[in-house]
Each structure stands twice: as structure tokens, then as C-alpha cells.
Design a protein with these regions (language model features):
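Sec-dependent N-terminal signal peptides
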Residues: 4-12
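Feature marking well-ordered beta-strand scaffolds used for ligand recognition
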Residues: 15-259
């Protein structure tokens, strides 16, 4: 699993940089968390691939592909699943895949890991939409403009207690939201050049902005075990974080040059 984590971090940063800098390529479970599965790959909310147990799942603009990686020296391609248009992100949680598209969020179950099966789709206005999941709720940021089309810049909280019938729970306005990460009652949202936001989500009816770090340009974020991993246009940054105090403390940076 440590090997998987290292690979995921490197490729995630590469994908994030290429996408948001206008280069070819794709874009990058909540937090640096295992998304509720014991052997789940770790990545950001804008990831285009993930690992669940012995299977690797990748997406392109139209398709979900599955691979058996139980033999790491000989991975086996298994199946294509047609997802429709505008597919952007993939996030695993509790035996399901949550797939962000420009038109909505698709839910697929992994009862048959070789061939994920469609459960439902939550539709929204056309925009970019990374997704993370915790408990009975999915957190989705919608961003308008540029390649994302649309005009909405917001956080949608979606009730997924019934996976077959996901429903909008609450919407909050944002500036220019990109990726996001959740850790218990703490939600981080990256606002691109407008900084990084930390929210208290203990009351989803009225989430509270704890702090806005306006000087931290951010594209995606991964909170894990009190370490906050922030992907920016210039590299991969690590911070300690304390949600109760509303503080983060700089640790280190891995610089990433634009390709």
C-alpha cells in the first residue's frame, strides 16, 4: 500500500498541474483517507484513478476502466463501463465509486469489482465538480468559467443516505472552488488563487467558515491524520492542521515545475 500511496501522490500532482495550467491530461477519498474501505487507494478529490482492494479504476472523459492488479507484475485489464460525457473525477467510499461529471455525480457499486454497476445519478448545472464523501453525505464543488462552462461557484451537500435517490441537502456560495477534502467535522475547500478555506461542518444546516488562508494558492487538498497536503500550481505543500483552533502550520514543499 505504501507503494500505491507514493505513486498516487506523484501522478495526482502531475495531473493537477497539467489540468489547471491548461496543459493536456486529466485532472486530480476524501482526505488522505481510505474512503471507508480498508484497502482503498489514496488521492485527492480531483483524481482520475483510484485503487480498491486488488483493483485499479481509471476514468477518461467517457469511460470507467477496471484492472486486476493482484499480480503487480502483470496487471490485467478487465472491462470498460460507458459513463456518458464530461467525466472528470473518481472517489471511492464504502464499496461504491462516486464519479464527478460536468453534468452531475454518478454512483456505481463495487459488488462486482471487475464490472462496477450503475446505482444512480445526481444531476446539476454544467460545471466542474470534484466530489468527496463522508457518512451519509457527498460534498461537491461546482466551478463555472473556462473549460468548466456554466456560471455556478458553490458547494453542494448531497444526502446519499439512499444511494438510489441522492438529494440536494444544502448549497453554499463560493468564489472559485476547486478540490476539497473532509476530515470528521473539518472541511477544506481550495479556491484556486483566492486561497484555502477551512470550515466547521458539525452542523450541515449552517456550516461555519473557521478561517480563510488567502495567501495559499490551492488546487486540491488532502487532510490525513492532522497533516494537510495542499496541491498548488507550484508544488505539493504539507501543513499540520488543527480544526478546533483554526490553524495550520507549514511543514514542507515539494516543488513541481510546469510541464
Amino acid at each position: 500500500m505504501k507503494k500505491y500511496i507514493s505513486i498516487l501522490i506523484i501522478v495526482l500532482v502531475s495531473c493537477e498541474s497539467s489540468s489547471d495550467l491548461g496543459l493536456s491530461g486529466g485532472r486530480g477519498e476524501t482526505s488522505f483517507s481510505a474512503g471507508g474501505d480498508s484497502n482503498t487507494g489514496i488521492g485527492g478529490s480531483m483524481a482520475r484513478f483510484t485503487i480498491v482492494d486488488d483493483y485499479l479504476y481509471t476514468i477518461d472523459s467517457w469511460t470507467l476502466k477496471s484492472y486486476d492488479i493482484s499480480d503487480q507484475q502483470n496487471p490485467l485489464y478487465k472491462e470498460d463501463v460507458n459513463l456518458g460525457w464530461g467525466i472528470e473525477t473518481i472517489f471511492p467510499y464504502n464499496g461504491n465509486l462516486f464519479i464527478g461529471a460536468q453534468s452531475g455525480m454518478h454512483i456505481y457499486n463495487l459488488d462486482n469489482k471487475e464490472s462496477p454497476e450503475w446505482v444512480s445519478t445526481y444531476e446539476h448545472m454544467t460545471s466542474c465538480d470534484p466530489v468527496v464523501v463522508q457518512g451519509d453525505y457527498a460534498f461537491v464543488t461546482l466551478r463555472g468559467g473556462t473549460e468548466c462552462q456554466g456560471f455556478n461557484n458553490q458547494l453542494d451537500i448531497i444526502d446519499i443516505s439512499d444511494l438510489v435517490r441522492p438529494e440536494l441537502f444544502k448549497t453554499y456560495s463560493m468564489i472559485n472552488p476547486h478540490g476539497l477534502g473532509v476530515d470528521d467535522n473539518c472541511l477544506f475547500i481550495t479556491e484556486g488563487e483566492y486561497g484555502l478555506k477551512m470550515f466547521d461542518i458539525s452542523n450541515l444546516e449552517n456550516i461555519e467558515l473557521i478561517k480563510h488562508f488567502e495567501d495559499i494558492s490551492s488546487i486540491d487538498v488532502i487532510p490525513f491524520n492532522d497533516i494537510l497536503m495542499v496541491i498548488g500550481s507550484d508544488g505539493f505543500h504539507q501543513y499540520n492542521y488543527d480544526c478546533e483552533l483554526g490553524e495550520i502550520e507549514y511543514i514542507s514543499t515539494i516543488p513541481i515545475n510546469s510541464l
